UniProtKB/Swiss-Prot annotation:
HAMAP family, A to Z: ThiG
Catalytic activity: [ThiS sulfur-carrier protein]-C-terminal-Gly-aminoethanethioate + 2-iminoacetate + 1-deoxy-D-xylulose 5-phosphate = [ThiS sulfur-carrier protein]-C-terminal Gly-Gly + 2-[(2R,5Z)-2-carboxy-4-methylthiazol-5(2H)-ylidene]ethyl phosphate + 2 H2O + H(+)
Organism: Bartonella bacilliformis (strain ATCC 35685 / KC583 / Herrer 020/F12,63)
Name listed for the protein in its UniProt record: Thiazole synthase
Keywords (A to Z) from UniProt: Cytoplasm, Schiff base, Thiamine biosynthesis, Transferase
Length: 257
């Protein structure tokens, strides 16, 4: 079972709720994927006027766990204030903490991220920290109280898939007991499988499903891909070799003179 701050879940696929063609498509995606956790931007809820209340009511009817996020925040103050508002609105101590450093790459500002995480941890938040694939940053986030860390595998929405598998693998190796979720950059189901084969606990994605030609079918594909990668990691994956190794035994082989 997947465990986030003492709560257990069966699905290892988390989904964003933006960019879907319609709420009904989103409903079908959640049902088909089996996901139990969806992320929601507070800015969407507060900026949408009367429609924001309708969307919040729609989410409550889905019977899934809501993970609010601080998407679009560029400063510590913005992120902390947004998290506080999200806690009041969604009635949860969970927050997916994002502090963006560059508007083009959407790369996290790791310095502001660590400081904001420390502030929010002191206020009792349970933080899901969106960060890069840098081990030292992950260790610093752990030091300030983050128990779920979400390294990217590529920039948000880029669909490039895991670019630095060595970096992602080192985070898993050095932090074996920490819950790790790949967040951002996943473009195809095979990317999700690769990430899970590295030993990660879950995948969070949005664009790859929402903007596909058939979001419902793609959601099912990702669900199966995540499970396949997780099962492969647990089973023990064969190490790559530089030379051929025969798979057929030679015992009993006929000898011709």
């Amino acid at each position: 079972m997947l465990n986030f701050y003492g709560h257990e879940f069966s699905s290892r696929l988390l989904l964003g709720t933006a960019q879907y063609p319609s709420p009904e498509i989103l409903r079908k995606v959640i049902d088909k994927s089996g996901t139990e956790i969806v992320t929601v931007s507070l800015r969407r809820e507060t900026a949408g006027g009367k429609h924001s209340g309708q969307f919040w009511q729609f989410l409550k009817e889905l019977n899934v766990t809501i993970l609010p996020n601080t998407a679009g925040c560029y400063t510590i103050k913005e992120a902390v204030t947004t998290a506080q508002l999200a806690r009041d609105l969604f009635k949860t101590p969970w927050i997916k903490l994002e502090v963006i450093g560059n508007p083009d790459t959407l790369q996290p500002n790791i310095f502001a991220l660590v400081e904001a995480a420390q502030i929010l941890n002191n206020e009792g938040f349970q933080i899901f920290a969106y960060t890069t694939d840098d081990l030292i940053v992950a260790e610093k986030l752990l030091e300030v109280g983050c128990r779920v860390i979400m390294p990217w595998c590529a920039p948000i929405g880029s669909a490039k898939g895991p670019r630095d598998t060595d970096g992602l693998r080192s985070i898993r190796a050095y932090l074996p007991d920490l819950t790790l979720v790949i967040d951002a950059g996943i473009g195809r189901p095979s990317h999700a499988t690769i990430a899970m084969e590295l030993g990660y606990d879950a995948i969070l994605l949005n664009t790859a499903v929402a903007k596909s030609g058939d979001p419902v079918l793609m959601a099912e594909a990702f669900s199966k891909a995540v499970n396949a990668g997780y099962m492969a990691y647990k089973a023990g994956i064969l190490e790559a070799r530089d030379v051929a190794v025969p798979s057929t035994p030679i015992i009993g082989k006929a000898v011709f003179s």
